[in-house]
């Protein structure tokens, strides 16, 4: 403890670990604790978090629980999917994209209640500590940050449990031993890491999966759906207009039923180590295929290729926690500009873990069937023009070839 803290806003789930952190903040810092619990669509009842906080001595006016599902999808998930953001070729950034919103809300609450510190439950080995704290500092540069996992001396699960028992923190029976793996979930995905998943040579046990059925157990008949887009954002499924959160929840249902969205990944953490995670992103997996499908006919080649070049950097910025950085905002502005004509409808076939694009249509389509056809009636296109095009593009290659020939190489 390096600084006197009067009031601290804790990102609080109501689970055992953050309940221990809550009591630790009270006993170690002597601070007044304010709890913030976010509903990001993790699928859990949040009222128990309120009751747990009250039980641990938090004043009712210091308990904040907010339904952020619509804001999460509208202002974070959808902008990210306009970029087709994928980290290291596979990861759809489900955990990463949730952290800046939580950090933003914590800072807003800190300003509202006059808190001089914020706290989180991320460990000292992971990426989340970086993501939370970069967000805090970006939004309130003079904020004090308390990261208990980097400060306290609880070196084992047994010591944590002993602390909980000492301070009469309720402990579920299944929490007394080490959990077989840790879970993070929101409306975009569910992730599992640690323990039984730490050996990358071993297959993920079936009991780890919570958001998807086994693709082999999925229906033998495919499911066909249509998704409508307006300026890069999905707005309707099968002709039914939905809010962002409702739409993603519906895609999750469809993906779950068809075994879509499982990913076993060894990724490179920002802090320097490799980690193995199991991700389930059913709705997001469908959405990515659909968005790329509508872009195929509405984006100019140059814009599409530039977007694909920018995407890895954009994804890396989100993964590493730089959502509020100017370079992410610069890239977002370019990406959003590219989406002004990305409107139309795609048709998809969902089948045993696969998302298959089977149709796309748009009033802004750049696809000209009369131009590309080999049949009679094609629009004016002089095949002889290709000769000059090829010769000009071959000029430097011919020059290089002449040099090699001259030097006998």
Curated annotation (Swiss-Prot):
CDD domains from the UniProt entry: ASS
Enzyme class: ligase
Record keywords: Amino-acid biosynthesis, Arginine biosynthesis, ATP-binding, Cytoplasm, Ligase, Nucleotide-binding
One cellular component (GO) term of this entry: cytoplasm
HAMAP family: Arg_succ_synth_type1 (MF_00005)
Subunit structure: Homotetramer.
Organismal lineage: Bacteria, Pseudomonadati, Pseudomonadota, Alphaproteobacteria, Hyphomicrobiales
Taxonomic superkingdom: Bacteria
Protein name: Argininosuccinate synthase
Catalytic activity field: L-citrulline + L-aspartate + ATP = 2-(N(omega)-L-arginino)succinate + AMP + diphosphate + H(+)
Gene name, Swiss-Prot/TrEMBL: argG
Functional pathway: Amino-acid biosynthesis; L-arginine biosynthesis; L-arginine from L-ornithine and carbamoyl phosphate: step 2/3
Signal sequence segment: none
Positions annotated to bind L-citrulline: 91, 96, 127, 131, 182, 191, 267, 279
EC assignment: 6.3.4.5
An individual GO BP term: L-arginine biosynthetic process
Organism the protein comes from: Nitrobacter hamburgensis (strain DSM 10229 / NCIMB 13809 / X14)
């Amino acid at each position: 403890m390096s600084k006197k803290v009067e009031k601290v806003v804790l990102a609080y789930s109501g689970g055992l670990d953050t309940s221990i952190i809550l009591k630790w903040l009270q006993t170690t810092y002597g601070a007044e604790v304010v709890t913030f619990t976010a509903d990001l669509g993790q699928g859990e009842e949040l009222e128990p978090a309120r009751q747990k906080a009250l039980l641990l001595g938090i004043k009712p006016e210091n308990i904040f629980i907010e339904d952020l599902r619509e804001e999460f999808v509208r202002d974070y998930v959808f902008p990210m999917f306009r970029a087709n953001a994928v980290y290291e070729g596979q990861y759809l950034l489900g955990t990463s994209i949730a952290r800046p919103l939580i950090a933003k809300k914590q800072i807003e609450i800190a300003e509202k209640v006059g808190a001089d510190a914020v706290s989180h439950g991320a460990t000292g080995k992971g990426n989340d500590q970086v993501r939370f704290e970069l967000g805090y500092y970006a939004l309130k540069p003079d904020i004090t940050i308390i990261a208990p996992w980097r400060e306290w001396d609880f070196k084992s699960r047994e010591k944590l449990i002993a602390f909980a028992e000492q301070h009469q923190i309720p402990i579920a029976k299944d929490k007394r031993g080490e959990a077989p793996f840790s879970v993070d979930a929101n409306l975009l995905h569910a992730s599992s890491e640690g323990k039984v998943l730490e050996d990358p040579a071993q297959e993920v046990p079936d009991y780890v999966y919570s958001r998807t059925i086994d693709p082999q157990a999925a229906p033998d008949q495919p499911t066909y759906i249509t998704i409508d887009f307006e300026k890069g954002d999905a707005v309707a499924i099968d002709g039914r207009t939905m809010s962002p959160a409702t739409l993603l929840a519906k895609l999750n249902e469809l993906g779950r039923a068809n075994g879509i969205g499982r990913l076993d990944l060894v990724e490179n953490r920002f802090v320097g180590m490799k980690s193995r995670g199991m991700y389930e992103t059913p709705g997001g997996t469908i959405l990515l295929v659909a968005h790329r499908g509508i872009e195929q006919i509405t984006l100019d080649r140059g814009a599409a290729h530039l977007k694909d070049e920018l995407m890895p950097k954009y994804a890396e910025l989100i993964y590493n926690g730089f959502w509020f950085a100017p370079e992410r905002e610069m890239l977002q502005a370019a990406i959003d500009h590219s989406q002004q004509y990305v409107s139309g409808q795609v048709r998809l076939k969902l089948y045993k873990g696969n998302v298959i694009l089977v149709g796309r249509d748009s009033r802004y389509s750049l696809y000209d069937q009369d131009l590309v056809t080999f049949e009679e009636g094609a629009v004016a296109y002089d095949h002889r023009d290709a000769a000059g095009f090829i010769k000009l593009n071959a000029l430097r290659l011919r020059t290089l070839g002449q040099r090699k020939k001259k030097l006998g190489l």
